[in-house]
């Protein structure tokens, strides 16, 4: 009964938070399209590249606060300790590190301007970006604390406020200040960062958390906390370094293919600002679920409740695979039209259709990383990410000078297929889960075939009625999606309970 209530609670929170995320992701995609039309794809590529370096600086200077607070405070709550003391450890460490990093970067802010000779990247802009690093670290800690106490709607509200302020600041500068030369693109980006992060800190700092555990004995000493935090921080830092290295290499390899610097930045901006967000846009439910299962699994691990670990992992994997297969079908069917709507040309649609097969692996990665973080397996994540990015960067260096833009897509396909196959094997072995592949793959495939026929039928009907392309995509997605979900529900009903009872007897014994 308790497990059923937990499952329903997790599903309810996932649906509600996904609705927040869908809105934010959609608005973010619209913002990228707006910036591309107003400033040009090259400027968006420049913003994306500098944003990648900013993300690296934020993570290296204390950006691991979210996962640290979410996981370690949940473990402390699970064992009846003092989570408030753990939070003080996390906040003190992250704030000290971020303030030192911001001060150091401010001192040497003249160096990038001198080396790169970019008119938009001056010392003033770099110092503005550095000023937001402590705010970024504190907001990450505050969000992680909310997740640990299961007050998951508060970070969602704060993210809405943050996005509105960031997008509003950037849009205002784009319309009124940048065209007149009163402000550079990157200075506008820096101001939007400060406005957004500041709003999150202000909002979440006003929220009071339970203090009934403050008198309990903390199971963590500061030394033990640091020993457990270092793998978490190392994993986040490694991913950020590899991701930024990959982003920096993309324009360089496009130059080797024969593109001009402006064309290289424009193609990079189109890939990162339109194509990748379009692929990730449907994954908002997986992103929310991944954040929710980290504290759930951490509490189950602290209580040595292997039954709950298996239940949560199995349910998350099943839902993710079934959902991802439907998205693959939709991208294959309507990728060209989506590309025309988002990018204004058929080339974007061709790349979306080309990359559709990698969608299940992308969405599984989101969920599996949540499982690994919840169970404290950060060392494996670090090693796997290292191998994954070695594959990605190797393919990038080989294929982009030969094939241009298609080489970027090929590198993304190669690293996701290899890295997530290994990640899935490790998660199954770690949890002792014995998935029934008939339910995970065969039944969704049967339902998918039926949904595909419905989608083709509805598409022909809508075209006959001469409906706009956008309306055709929405109607087909809604009707075929409901049919797919209904068929899956009907064919998965028999024997579900008996399988789960059987599947959850291994580790307990």
Spans of features found by a protein language model:
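Alpha-helical transmembrane segments of multi-pass membrane transport and lipid-handling proteins
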Residues: 91-115, 310-361, 393-394
